[in-house]
A protein has these predicted regions:
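Two-component/phosphorelay signaling modules centered on CheY-like receiver
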Residues: 16-33, 100
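Acidic, metal-coordinating helix/loop segments flanking the phosphotransfer/catalytic sites
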Residues: 34-52
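Active-site residues of response regulator receiver
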Residues: 56, 86
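The feature encodes the CheY-like receiver
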Residues: 60, 90, 109
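C-terminal output helix
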Residues: 110-119
């Protein structure tokens, strides 16, 4: 069966345990790159396009809001691929994050199935050239074709 290129996720979070968990949840469907803080995330965003950006807002400077501001200034369309995954947001912070026209927001601790569904939805709605919907559809079609061939033999 031909290989299907996985969408690439940039995970920007300073918590190593969170990064390990999210990577484990996503590894089957996505390639995950990790940026350990906002500055590292901004540097990666300057040089590469990602299908989905998972962003923690509560990090040492620069925080996640600085990353959102960078995207708003340099390529507003990429905000649609941002899924904020963060803890203990106040109502004003939540409103501020949503004002950036992000794909979604999930609180920590999170349900792993809800996270996976949200990341897939962000990949589809981001509008980039490699939406997960097309990738998964292609993979499903190829798998079905293999199953049909196996039954006919």
């Amino acid at each position: 069966m031909p290989s299907v290129e996985k969408p690439v996720v940039l995970l920007i979070d300073d918590n190593e345990a969170t990064c390990t968990l999210i990577t484990a949840v996503l590894h089957r469907d996505f390639l995950v790159e990790i940026a350990a803080d906002g500055q590292d995330g901004i540097e990666r965003l300057r040089t590469k396009r990602y299908d989905v950006i998972i962003l923690d807002l509560r990090m040492p400077q620069p925080d996640g809001f600085a990353v959102l501001e960078f995207l708003e200034q340099h390529d507003k369309r990429r905000l649609r691929s941002v899924l904020v995954v963060t803890a203990a947001l106040t109502a004003p912070e939540m409103a501020r994050a949503k004002a950036f026209d992000i794909c979604g927001l999930i609180g920590k601790p999170f349900d792993v199935d809800a996270l996976l569904d949200a990341v897939k939805q962000c990949a589809v709605s981001s509008g980039d050239g490699n939406p997960i919907g097309n990738v998964l559809s292609s993979g499903v079609i190829l798998l079905l074709a293999d199953l049909i061939r196996a039954r006919l033999m």
